[in-house]
Amino acid sequence: MYKEKLRESFKVYDEIVLKCFCGIFIGAIVAICEVVFGKGLEWILNFREHMGCVMLVGLPFAGLAIVFLFDHWGRISRKGMGLVFEVDQGKSDWIPLRMAPFMVVSTWITHFFGGSAGREGVAMQIGATVSHYFGKYFCFKNSGVIFMVAGMAAGFAGLFGTPITAIFFALEVLVAGTLKYRAMSCAIPASFTAAYVSSLFGLHKSTFKIGSVSDLDVELSIKLLVLGILFGLIGGLFAFSLKHTKAFVANKIKNPYKRIFMMGILVAILLFVFGKCRYSGVGENLIVGSFTSEKIYSYDWILKFVLTILTLSAGFQGGEVTPLFAIGSSLGVIIAPVFGLNPLFVAALGYCSVFGAATNTFLAPIAIGMEVFGYQYFPFFFVVCAIAYIVNQNESIYALQRQVRE
């Protein structure tokens, strides 16, 4: 009996060690893919900024190319993150390897011609696709999903350089309110390996200083409570608006070619009229501006909000997370004087809590606040992100995300 238990224990530990080594392998492979994607996107964004708004002329035609690409060769790959959720839920057992390059190319096209979108979703799809492919070669229980979660963590960490955030996000995003504990032994080494390898090739996380903050007293706690409610509502509204705008546009313009072309014209005009391409791209300019001396306008956050939703609803590709960072931080700068708080501090709170509310996650936004702004601000991030998570009404930018809440 004792020997049997000992044998079982060794078997469990052997599996954990194997998962750790697999995680390192996944992290390294995914990181290289993220470097290609990230460096390519970096060049595209710099080129488009140098060219100014002239690239917007091609946005509707770029949309046609994206639809044609998926229609003729992408097929099921067009589901993107939706397919990742389907695999986790057992609705599908296959992520085609071609999904990664198709998402990369279509995202590059979107940004090359000035669309307002992010990059995180694509980074995680790259990781999920690559890791799920290797998962089929291992026979331990739920290896496909475990590898997929590890790949998502590696994808996030490889592009953003925030391994702790990546781990929490990958573990909690598939089913809100719970964690994929079984994937931890694979996701942790995958995430840290990806962050390290990508840093060797020049992909580093962004960090900002927000200065000193007063002690967490009753007055500040009340202000944080109100800020948490506000940021939570904005994040939830973004997720709600994205879901319903996509459905509305798809219902009104059923032909995907007409839809993306007509919406592409609308988005291009709006991007030019409002800000001369200020709201094109991932929103890095608004994020940096929020934490430096650059001018942030009172309408920056709402225009980035609307134009990102319109871009993604049209059928253009890209993520939502970096625009959410931009929306939250630029909103924080504007409302800080109302609360009598340091604008950099409120911008940091908005940066992480709007992201958390829109993705319906709790631990990841706290983690990214600490990794980007400093671990000493943990109590403040915890309070605001907790409130934002509570008030977002279970809305999520991921339509297939399941919720488990008592």
What are these regions (language model features)?
Residues 1-406:
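Alpha-helical transmembrane segments and immediately membrane-proximal extracytoplasmic
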